[in-house]
Amino acid sequence: MRRIKLVVSYDGTAYCGWQLQPNGVTIEEVLNKALSSLLKEDIQVIGASRTDSGVHAMGNVAVFDTESRIPGDKICFALNQRLPDDVRIQASEEVPLTFHPRKANCVKTYEDKILNRKIDMPLQRLYSYFCYFNLDLEKMQKAASYLIGEHDFKSFCAVRTQAEETVRTIYSLDITKVNDLITIRISGSGFLYNMVRIIAGTLVKIGMGVYPPEKMEEILEEKNRAAAGPTIPARGLTLVSLEYEKELAPYLEGENKHWHYVLDQRNVPEKGLAYLTIERCEPEELDGVLRRVIHQAYRNGAKRVFVRDTFGEEGSICGYYRLRRQPETEEGWLEAVYEGEHR
């Protein structure tokens, strides 16, 4: 058995998103059918990002398992002959069977385009959101700066999201304008359901002058979807790329006004041991930080995590932690369990 990775680009206009749907054609369905026809076996792809209806992609990633002996880097050429014109495989390669496109650490980059002029342009209508009101780019850029870093983005996700954890890290958020077209380019560790489109909708409101730029920080603190702006239409949104981590980062750091921690992963590859130092943390956020960061360490290969704090009573949370699976939950949620200070 071999695992093949695909880099997939598509015009999402005619599709009901990525994920299989009972009442509409999806990208996943098209790929499954084309691959099954090409390889003469039942193929089910696993996508990295399950984009919504109307969202486009330049570099989404998918994998599938096959018994075929066709060279991995040649599959893209054969597969493109069987795909519709609005779906193309940009590259294909064989990867380890352990590689999972949704579980591997990566940086996701999206672009959301806004056509900002008095009269709509028909040629842009499927690939941008039209805004009649003049938008103040400087105010939008200032507001965007509040979102950089690790934050709880609960205000910026759809109410019906299934995510139990709403903390994400934004590495960059750039807003540029060329002629009448504004591009919001955002890179992060991952995104909640509708998160990019809600951020874009909030930035539009700030650009219109409905909110001052400083309102963005207040919206973050609210942790309430009703506090943020509207979810703008999907047609202007494109998944640009997913850049996977080639080797484990020696350190992970998370910092905002509520917490600051450093996760040392240098001993994970050889000893399976990570060290988490919590420099400061508000008491009500501590359980969430512990659970989230220890879970990330285990995903990265750690078997145990040693925690120490420098902000509170010495020894209050210090010691070794492991993860315990909760069998009573369908998802098998992993809970951080204190083991004590023994080795």
PLM region descriptions:
Residues 1-262:
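Structured-RNA-binding interfaces characteristic of tRNA pseudouridine synthases
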Residues 50, 92-94, 309, 327-330:
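Proline- and acidic/polar-enriched loop/turn elements at helix boundaries
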Residues 104-106, 175-180, 266-271, 324-332:
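Short, ordered beta-strand-loop transition motifs
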Residues 170-174, 319-321, 336:
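A short beta-strand motif that forms the metal-chelation/ATP-contact edge
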Residues 257, 263-272, 278-279:
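A conserved beta-strand-loop-helix scaffold within acyl/acetyltransferase catalytic domains
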Residues 271-322, 328:
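Acyl-donor binding region in acyl/amide transferases
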Residues 328-343:
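C-terminal "cap" of GNAT-fold acetyltransferases
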